[in-house]
Amino acid sequence: MDIITIIIGIVGIAAGFAIAKIIEKSNISNLIKNAKKEAASILKDANLEAENIKKDKILQAKERFIELKSEHEQVILARDKKVAEVEKRVRDKESQVSNELSKAKKVNDEFEAKTAEYNNKIEVLDKKQAEVDKLHKSQLQQLEVISGLSAEEAKEQLVEGLKAEAKTKAMSHIQETIEEAKLTAQQEAKKIIINTIQRVGTEEAVENCVSVFNIESDDVKGRIIGREGRNIRALEAATGVEIIVDDTPEAIILSCFDPVRREIARLSLHKLVTDGRIHPARIEEVVAKTAKQIDDEIIEVGKRTVIDLGIHGLHPELIKVVGRMKYRSSYGQNLLQHSREVSKLCGIMAAELGLNVKLAKRAGLLHDIGKVPDTESDLPHALLGMQWAEKYGEKDEVCNAIGAHHDEIEMKSLLSPIVQVCDAISGARPGARRQVLDSYIQRLKDLEDVAYGFSGVKNAYAIQAGRELRVIVESEKVSDDNAANLSFEISQKIQTEMTYPGQVKVTVIRETRAVNIAK
């Protein structure tokens, strides 16, 4: 039973295997057929796709060909158009050249005709000239026979007579012209000067050496004086101004010949009284700040002055010098007002004479800058001012006008006499100057300069109208013993070299300070 079952199983397996093989062969055959069909279909599609691509490419190639053909035709048309234009221009040019040649030929023919006519006329004139010369020679011979003189002798007599007559008439005419010119020149000069003076209106300016500082009450005087006078001494030492506190109600008098120092003292007092803190350290601080403020104001005054007068391109140092003129005087006349007046006069006079107005005003404004520097110089102020002008690049005409307005050097331009005349007009006005005041101020300056001539002197201030000279020395260079000797030497030099009324008290002040800063 088992064997039969096994045999049947084996036969079944064999039969199944055979059947599987048959089925597998059948499937493979079907797959091959399907693959062939699919391959045929793909090949057919590929052929169709290739045909379509081929048609598209052919179509694109045709379109590109048409496009290139169109562009080529346009290029050819443009080129043909340009060629046609060039040919037209060439034809026009040829026509123009032909016309020009025709005109030139016509002109040449006319020129040749006129030349021939001219030559004929020259021949006729030559014949007539020969006849005239022959006739002239014949008449000249007849005149020589009649007059008994040769032609040369007759010419000489005629020329001499004409010379004498012409000389007489010329001398008479020259004399009349000179007299008329003198009369006219005097009249015109007077007219110009009168018109110039009438067109400038200025105030009478008289400087003094005293300023009055008004206070609200007399109680302020005690605070200004300070304990044992230390505040007033510190203020006088810092400013170089004599401060007079007397019985004048609600007023303190500031006395100093230098207007800059006096103004610094006045402004410093105003700040101290307004602030209320008055002591030596505060006084020195306020005076230093006020001096800086005055320097800034000087520059501002200089700028405003040159702008008002229409002067441009002035060196900053010269602008500062112009500003310092506000605090200088000449024979009692404020130097800035005087220089402004001279500048305006020069401008008006230059306009009347047809000269450079701006250059004339510039020279007029700067003509007295030699009076401004604080340092003493042996040169006259006109030459010193000329040196300053040359140093800061002013033109030669301006420099010469500055240096020659008091005849120290030769005048080399027309501006120089104008500046000289206008300076004289400004200074010669009635009430314009007071020579006594100027000589007084010069005496005080000379007094201070005597002290500055000694070694170790830091500051020197002439006060009490020149009756006292306060000298502040450097403690490192001058000892206490030397201070007394220095006072004696200064007094002896003043007595020897200067002329002064009364007596001059020389006070030498030596102060030692030790300063440290706590940080």
Swiss-Prot record:
It is found in: Cell membrane. Keywords: Cell membrane, Endonuclease, Hydrolase, Membrane, Nuclease, RNA-binding, Transmembrane, Transmembrane helix. The chain crosses the membrane at residues 3-23. One of its GO terms (biological process) is mRNA catabolic process. It is a single-pass membrane protein. Residues 209-275 form the KH domain. The keyword Metal-binding does not apply. GO terms for cellular component: plasma membrane. GO terms for molecular function: RNA binding; RNA endonuclease activity. Pfam families: HD, KH_1, RNase_Y_N. Its main location: membrane. The keyword Membrane applies. It is an enzyme of class 3 (hydrolase). PROSITE patterns: HD, KH_TYPE_1. Residues 335-428 form the HD domain. Its EC number is 3.1.-.-. InterPro entries: HD/PDEase_dom, HD_domain, HDIG_dom, KH_dom, KH_dom_type_1, KH_dom_type_1_sf, Ribonuclease_Y, RNase_Y_N. SMART domains: HDc, KH. Endoribonuclease that initiates mRNA decay. Belongs to the RNase Y family. NCBIfam families: HDIG, RNase_Y. This is Ribonuclease Y. It comes from Flavobacterium johnsoniae (strain ATCC 17061 / DSM 2064 / JCM 8514 / BCRC 14874 / CCUG 350202 / NBRC 14942 / NCIMB 11054 / UW101) (Cytophaga johnsonae).
